[in-house]
Amino acid sequence: DTPYQAHVWMVNTGPHTGDLAWVMGAVTFTDLDSRPESEEHTEDWMKNVMPNVKKVSDGEYWKQDEKVSYSPEGSFTGKEIWTVYDIVPFEGYRFTALLENVVEVYKAKNYPNYFQVYRSQFDGGNGHDVAIGFGFKNYAFFDEDEKFWKDYEEVHGEGSRWKFFEEYREVVKGSYDELSEFMPELSSGE
């Protein structure tokens, strides 16, 4: 696997509905310093890609927080819910504690879906502080009864979800969801 892979996602809900999201990586900043450059690639990009782009928005750099992420083998499905959070300034450590509790449930219950946490590397002034990607296999998942909070209380004790909600209200200013689907035909890797 090369860090210079492009992944294209179609956004189906949320503020960017109908947009294509172009994602490069996983890549480090060090990788960016040595990425391949060629006049041929630049010309191809300008001639064949950019004429099809109506607008470019929200260029952001995100870094996965492995400590509060959960990615079991084979969990990539190509369908994902992204929730982007605006965290109260200087309360990120409290939000991280909430995420640690969530990941503990995923591990204890051996959930098949991934839960990947990313932190914005630069303040864009847009409230995009933390993004969580949650994978699911098919849309029928949304017809199933929600069992997470039942599992949460089995792991953390009766009434623990209400403590979670109280803490959440104090540290999260806002959030939004986007449902996206991976487009392998426009991507260079999974």
Regions found by a protein language model. Name each.
Residues 1-190:
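Short S/T/G/P-rich N-terminal loop/turn motif that feeds into the first structured element of a domain
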